[in-house]
């Protein structure tokens, strides 16, 4: 996904959960492939660390938002066709796909379907349950014929579930 798509998605999720901001503008996005098989174990550790190190007194400050933004950035890319090994296109095709995804994401986030996803996603109670869900939904995703529209639905569902679950786990950890 392109940076603007990540920002639109983050804004929609954060607005729906009344959180501040989610940032992910790190240079590692250029050097670290955003592919499930390569980075998911690291993202799983980042989720665990985020929850374990959450400081109730600081809340969702800029640093916390940036950390959650990194997690969500990778999750979104796991459900973006060009970031998966079976993508047949080249870099140019990848850029066109993400351009279409950017415009599609912007439009989708204004729909009733997007609002319904926000309302109905599950909030998991443990990192193990959450990462099991992510593995399962990614496995299902990999079996599909991919379209921009289908990617957007998976991205919004997965990312909203992750944020809702992480915030749920943090609330248990601190309160």
Protein language model features and the residues they cover:
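N-terminal leader/auxiliary helical segments
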Residues: 1-70, 75-175
């Amino acid at each position: 996904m392109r940076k603007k798509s990540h920002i639109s998605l983050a804004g929609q999720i954060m607005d729906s959960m009344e959180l501040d901001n989610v940032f992910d503008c790190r240079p590692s996005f250029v050097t670290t492939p955003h592919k499930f098989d390569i980075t998911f174990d690291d993202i799983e550790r980042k989720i665990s660390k985020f929850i374990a190190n959450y400081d109730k007194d600081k809340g969702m400050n800029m640093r916390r938002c940036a950390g959650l933004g990194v997690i969500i950035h990778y999750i979104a890319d796991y459900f973006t066709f060009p970031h998966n090994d079976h993508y047949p296109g080249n870099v140019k095709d990848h850029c066109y796909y993400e351009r279409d995804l950017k415009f599609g994401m912007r439009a989708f986030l204004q729909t009733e379907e997007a609002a319904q996803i926000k309302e109905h996603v599950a909030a998991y109670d443990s990192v193990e349950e959450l990462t099991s869900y992510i593995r399962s939904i990614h496995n299902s995703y990999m079996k599909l014929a991919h379209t921009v529209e289908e990617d957007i639905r998976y991205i919004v569902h997965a990312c909203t579930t992750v944020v809702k679950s992480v915030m749920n786990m943090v609330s248990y950890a601190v309160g």
